[in-house]
Amino acid sequence: MTFRHCVAVDLGASSGRVMLARYDSKHRTLTLREIHRFVNCLQKTDGFDTWDIDSLEKDIRLGLKKVCNEGILIDSIGIDTWGVDYVLLDKQGQRVGLPVSYRDNRTTGIMPQALVQIGKSEIYRRSGIQFLPFNTIYQLRALTKQQPELTAQVAHALLMPDYFSYRLTGEMNWEYTNATTTQLVNINTDDWDDTLLAWTGAKKSWFGRPSHPGNVIGDWICPQGNRIPVVAVASHDTASAVIASPLANKHSAYLSSGTWSLMGFESKMPYTTDEALAANITNEGGAEGRYRVLKNIMGLWLLQRVLKERRITDLPALIAQTEALPACRFLINPNDDRFINPDDMRAEIQAACRETDQPVPVSDAELARCIFDSLALLYADILHELANLRGEKFTQLHIVGGGCQNSLLNQLCADACGIRVMAGPVEASTLGNIGIQLMTLDELNNVDDFRQVVSANYDLTTYIPNPDSEIARHVAQFQPKRQTKELCA
């Protein structure tokens, strides 16, 4: 068979897509086509910020049916989503309540309890995962303490991509890359950690052993009656994005830029030293036994909220106005937990500037300038931190995901980091999803083989650092004095 058709379901925190990939194995060409796009947003349910999971499932099925109705024979399906959130099921496999979003405030004050009762170094020694107040470990603790009546009904807990795979196939699976984001997987055994899980109050029987990417979970029966394999891809969207990052060598770092920015490097070994703990470095699971050694950055969430609040629809025009403004007049720490989900992002940014005796951004362009400059400076700090951790400098940074379309931010990043930036591909999560499917179908050998396909089929844009730019001069003057505040650590 010369052609393969694979479908990637890629769910983000603000939107979802069903994408069709066509791979020509003879010429090693890979094309993507968007079949269906839909909105994903939070809703208030009984006082909690929850996901409209039934609407998401409806749109996933609609997208799959659209492909089938075109007469295309699908070879496989894969699903990737964000991490940490989960869906509860009873003994009959029916949903118990609605999944609560990681942005809900129910976990407030929970993480400090764990640090006292288990110990920060002990949690890190076991999991190797960064401390974020919304990690699944703290969500489950909040669930069992705050909603015992719900807990009593639970027989299974599935992470988001595993839930949708279950709904398509009837088979349960706990995919490894997403499971590691929970802070509940033991970094030495790749299985759930008994001590950490016991602290949450959740039962170990709710979970099956995590499985690495590349296994077939089960089949979805399409409207025409064909049985289509559903593959457990690297179901954490960042894990998929990293798979599609055309990293040239060990001196390349990556930045997955979207609602969240995740900056890191690939490693065959985890970094769980005291230095890594102090820097709140995470060691999330990747494909082929690789670790994604990285740090979370609040990312373009701040901009997305400002755009929504200000009802801005012309982003290119805003970026053009922003580019005309001087750099580094308004600076915030994007990783301050005050920006996780404020009632008014614009007001929160202004308050942060006011509290640090800076000018206050008023116009939309000034707010955007504040966000872009602040992100670029944080990128520079974290890249320096990662280089120190591994004892080697990076020579290149690959920016992938939707945020890599922002040419202003890309150049600011290159200037602040003092490093060459390669931007693209945009559809990194979708491509990485497809890559694992093609490996499972025996069309590709491994991740490195797939990256060669990505490099050959997708154009990258190069940004050369300008040492004379305003932000580069700012870094040269102030970076030795700057300290990176950890996101909610």
UniProtKB/Swiss-Prot annotation:
EC class of the enzyme, as a word: transferase
EC number: 2.7.1.5
Annotated residues for binding of ATP: 13-17, 259, 304, 402
Domain of life: Bacteria
GO function term, MF aspect, one: rhamnulokinase activity
Family: Belongs to the rhamnulokinase family.
Catalytic residues of the enzyme: 237
Name of the molecule in the record: Rhamnulokinase
Pathway of action: Carbohydrate degradation; L-rhamnose degradation; glycerone phosphate from L-rhamnose: step 2/3
Name of the gene: rhaB
GO BP, one annotated term: glycerol metabolic process
Keyword Iron carried by entry: no
InterPro entries: ATPase_NBD (IPR043129), FGGY_C (IPR018485), FGGY_N (IPR018484), Rhamnulokinase (IPR013449)
Catalytic activity from the UniProt record: L-rhamnulose + ATP = L-rhamnulose 1-phosphate + ADP + H(+)
Keyword set includes Electron transport: no
